[in-house]
Amino acid sequence: MYFKNLQKIFTLTLIVLFFSQFNVLIKDNFPVPNGFKNMLFYIQRNINKNTILYELNYNENGELNESEPIKVNWINYETDKSLEALNYIQRSFAYGLNIKILDKQKKSYSFNFVSYKKKILYLIKSSIDKQYHVYYTINKKMFIVQKIHIQIEGGTFWVPKVKYLEIILNDPSNNEKKIEKIIP
């Protein structure tokens, strides 16, 4: 009896490990946006391959648009790979940004997602490579945001149940990858 229970536990453990590895593989098999020279980061969700793209927004003079420094678009990988602006609902309740200027001279900004105000991100020009990056802080240390994965399980079309977010980061001091998991 003891060995039979032990065998069941072992089998269940293997199944759980297999499917957790499978979930990681699914995320890794998502398309990576390329060909966007002003890309800051992107968001992907487990429900489909469509991707939300966040890019620097320059004006016609080639300067960063102070009133809207980040533009947000969909890449429709599920259909024709077209690029589309967010609609009103997506922009106002899900993937849009609340942006505030931190330093007008340096053109640095803080922002949060309209759907999740608890975490602040920063758009700052790096003193190292002189490029703009989006930064996220952990224990007062700044990391560069590369992508965000949203795991949705259940809910409805209008109110999906977000199980967790994974923010994939890069440590600019040593170029190491770091993942911050947030359970809302």
Task: Label every PLM stretch briefly.
Residues 23-92, 177-178:
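N-terminal export/targeting and maturation segments
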Residues 1-30:
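Bacterial Sec-dependent N-terminal signal peptides
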Residues 42, 79-83, 88, 93, ...:
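Long, compositionally biased low-complexity segments enriched in polar/charged residues
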Residues 36, 63, 97, 155-156:
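Intrinsically disordered, low-complexity regions
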Residues 110-184:
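Extracytoplasmic electrostatic interaction patches
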